[in-house]
Amino acid sequence: MRKRQPVLKQEKTLNPELKTWLYASGSLTQQLTELGGGKFSVKPFKEHFQRLTFADSQWMNMPHTHTSWVRETYLYGSDVEPWVKAKSIFPIQSLQKKARIFQHIGSKPIGLFLFQRTTPLCDRRVIRLPEGWTRQSCYTWHGCKFIVQETFLPAFEAFLYQQHDKELL
């Protein structure tokens, strides 16, 4: 007789507390800073140029032959481990306009500029990637389109569970 492997529900089902974060509007930077008790940092780990993927080009209504500038970072709250892996995709056309500022922000969060005195248009989708639950947002900001992908990592989910357990005590 074959032994059944246990099914890990948390891998396939969405925790209600995490769902709130995946569908929250506004600045994730501000929300993570508040959750972390004022602690928040950005650690860029990769910046490069690449051709738009077919899916991304369709979502932004641009030719897939266009080049984009990609910035990948880890977002930290009050933990030593990163909470979020962020990937921002800026088509070259957007970098020739106001969005060029994002190429030069270093370890500053995109949200600091994106939500400053404006509320950009945002289309959002939520997907499950191997690294974790992910929200992908296609922003239109001052006429510039770009994608910000935020994957909530296991350390963030663990922090949410700890916070939830504290509230129950």
UniProtKB/Swiss-Prot annotation:
Keyword match Cytoplasm: yes
Pathway the protein acts in: Cofactor biosynthesis; ubiquinone biosynthesis
GO process annotations (BP): pyruvate biosynthetic process; ubiquinone biosynthetic process
GO cellular component: cytosol
Catalytic activity: chorismate = 4-hydroxybenzoate + pyruvate
Residue intervals passing through the bilayer: none
Database matches in InterPro entries: Chorismate--pyruvate_lyase, Chorismate_lyase_/UTRA_dom_sf
Enzyme class label: lyase
Keywords, sorted A to Z: Cytoplasm, Lyase, Pyruvate, Ubiquinone biosynthesis
GO molecular function: chorismate lyase activity
Cellular compartment(s): Cytoplasm
UniProt-listed SUPFAM superfamilies: Chorismate lyase-like (SSF64288)
EC number assigned by the record: 4.1.3.40
Residues given in the record as substrate binding sites: R71, I110, E150
Similarity comment: Belongs to the UbiC family.
Role this protein plays: Removes the pyruvyl group from chorismate, with concomitant aromatization of the ring, to provide 4-hydroxybenzoate (4HB) for the ubiquinone pathway.
Protein name, per record: Probable chorismate pyruvate-lyase
